[in-house]
Amino acid sequence: MKRCVPLEPQAEAVCQASSKPPLIFELPVAQGRMVLEEAQDSPVYKYPARAKRVVVNTGRWGAIPVYLVEPETVCTPANVILYIHGAGWVFGSYHTHEKLVRELAARTGSLLIFPEYSRSPEVRYPTAIEQCYSVMCMVPELVRNMGYTANPDTFTVAGDSVGGNMATALTLMSKFRRGPEIQKQLLYYPVTNACFNKGSY
């Protein structure tokens, strides 16, 4: 049974405007990325937080930008969230997710680490997930460089859509490889099934 969820008028207006063809996945990759980036340019409230961009070497998987987001108030020892962005493995960036991750950091008092992994079609599986795993293994060092000590009892992996898929995969990889101990998952509408004809889709 389908359930209708009422939206705020502003959200409904965005949905209506973005439902007109061509849809983002129907555009050439570069154009689709530009459309998504520009959609996030409108002025909106962003929670107070400092963001620092660093470049992290993930070994054979290459160097990638990683954003370290620090809210005004941080718990001690620091709760840490590793956030993996969604948008189909093809789109998405720190810019498209900045409002969300700043709010998540500010409202939880957590340090947030955001790897801007290499996207398809420029790279193929397993590059993106291995890059994220490498960054996850570097979390204690990244947090120390921010002047904090990470709280191992609250380490959280989070993500939206395919980012939720990757956060789930990171949890399994870490278990099988005996890597960092993940305590919590925060998954926003994660991709857990590729079937488009199921009720959950």
Language model feature labels by segment:
Residues 141-158:
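Gly/Ser-rich "nucleophile elbow"/oxyanion-hole loop immediately N-terminal to the catalytic nucleophile
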Residues 77-88:
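Short beta-strand element of the alpha/beta-hydrolase
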Residues 116-120:
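Short beta-to-alpha linker loops that shape the active-site pocket of alpha/beta-hydrolase fold enzymes
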Residues 152-154, 168-201:
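Alpha/beta hydrolase fold serine-hydrolase catalytic domain that processes acyl esters and thioesters
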Residues 1-71:
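A glycine/proline-hinged amphipathic helix-loop "lid/cap" segment
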Residues 95-114:
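Short amphipathic alpha-helix adjacent to the substrate-entry channel of hydrolases
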Residues 159, 163, 167:
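Gly/Ala-rich beta-loop-alpha elbow adjacent to hydrolase catalytic centers
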Residues 123-145:
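Alpha/beta-hydrolase active-site loop
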